[in-house]
């Protein structure tokens, strides 16, 4: 039996965050926000995974980040996906060139993976959000 999840509503301020001098008049809450509602659009098709490695660093995805993955989304050109290629899980961007399918890293230290006939490749889901700490 599935447990009912308790919502955690946190304040969402209506004012934008200033990169300069903040206005004291912007000190009010517009509404509350539950992060689950924000990042999980399809609960039955969503999972989280922690990143290991730096092949996607130029896409803003760092070692140790947590990814929100949605299995219900179409893995189209340009999307970042989790794929199982010949038994190995990889995090890459989908690209098509000359009628061929590639999984591209976002770090020039790594090579793209060309998906060739006979290879096993299953897309497990599309990355929708990246969660990482900045401190």
Annotated model-derived regions:
Residues 93-94, 105-106:
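Residue-level recognition of conserved beta-strand positions in structured domain cores
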Residues 94-96, 100:
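Well-ordered alpha/beta subsegment
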Residues 1-57, 88-89, 100, 111, ...:
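Short, positionally conserved secondary-structure boundary motifs
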Residues 64-65, 79:
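Structural motif
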Residues 44-46, 76-81:
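Short, hydrophobic/aromatic-rich segments at coil-to-beta transitions
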């Amino acid at each position: 039996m599935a447990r009912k999840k308790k919502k955690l509503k946190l304040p969402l301020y209506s004012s934008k965050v200033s990169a300069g001098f903040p206005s004291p008049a912007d000190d009010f809450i517009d509404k509350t926000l539950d992060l689950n509602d924000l990042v999980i659009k399809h609960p039955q098709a969503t999972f989280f995974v922690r990143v290991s490695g730096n092949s996607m660093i130029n896409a803003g995805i760092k070692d140790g980040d947590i990814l929100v993955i949605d299995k219900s989304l179409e893995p189209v050109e340009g999307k970042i996906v989790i794929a199982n290629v010949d038994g190995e899980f990889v995090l890459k961007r989908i690209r098509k060139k000359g009628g061929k399918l590639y999984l591209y890293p976002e770090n020039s230290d790594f090579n793209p993976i060309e998906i060739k006939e006979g290879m096993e490749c299953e897309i497990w889901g599309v990355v929708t959000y990246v969660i990482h700490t900045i401190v």
